[in-house]
């Protein structure tokens, strides 16, 4: 199962960027209150709706890219997490066509230290922010990740059909062209 991930935050950043759904532009949401940095490129899976009402989150094991970069990926596992708003799962991915990542097929193929580093980040990155918390977290394998992607796609399709969700991609007329007022 391949899918597109839109990167919002490159690996190594403390700045938390988000796609502004109204304009399609990248907005600085905040700088993390803790001295932690994102352990992988972080973004969302296109055409999904997670349990928290946002597109399903994704981490991509890749050299740092840039906000707005679109990467074709495949899931290798998922970090099941609950925060102050409820379920906030993070799908762990690799680029689909990267031969350097071909050996990573499921969560147990990821080095234990790398899993612990990602887990530690998500357990502490909200610690100093008032009203924010991480309640519980655990790793699950590729099949669970793919099942959650399918469920998130269904939630997205149902919400769009009901008219209760707007596509997080570039909004129509988000970048209107400047009208020529020279009279020429």
What is each model feature region?
Residues 1-184:
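Hydrophobic N-terminal alpha-helices or hydrophobic patches in metabolic proteins across all domains
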């Amino acid at each position: 199962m391949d899918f597109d991930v839109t990167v919002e935050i490159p690996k190594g950043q403390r700045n938390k960027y988000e796609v502004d759904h109204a304009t399609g532009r990248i907005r600085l949401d905040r700088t993390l209150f803790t001295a932690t940095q994102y352990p992988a490129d972080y973004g969302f899976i296109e055409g999904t709706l997670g349990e928290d009402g946002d597109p399903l989150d994704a981490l991509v094991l890749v050299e740092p890219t840039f906000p707005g970069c679109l990467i074709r990926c495949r899931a290798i596992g998922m970090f099941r997490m609950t925060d102050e708003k409820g379920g906030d799962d993070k799908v762990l991915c690799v680029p689909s066509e990267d031969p350097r990542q071909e050996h990573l097929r499921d969560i147990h193929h990821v080095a234990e230290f790398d899993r612990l580093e990602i887990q530690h980040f998500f357990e502490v990155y909200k610690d100093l922010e008032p009203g924010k918390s991480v309640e519980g977290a655990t790793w699950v394998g590729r099949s669970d990740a793919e099942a959650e992607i399918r469920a998130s796609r269904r939630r997205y399709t149902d919400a769009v059909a009901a008219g209760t969700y707007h596509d997080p991609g570039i909004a129509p007329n988000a970048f209107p062209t400047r009208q020529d007022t020279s009279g020429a």
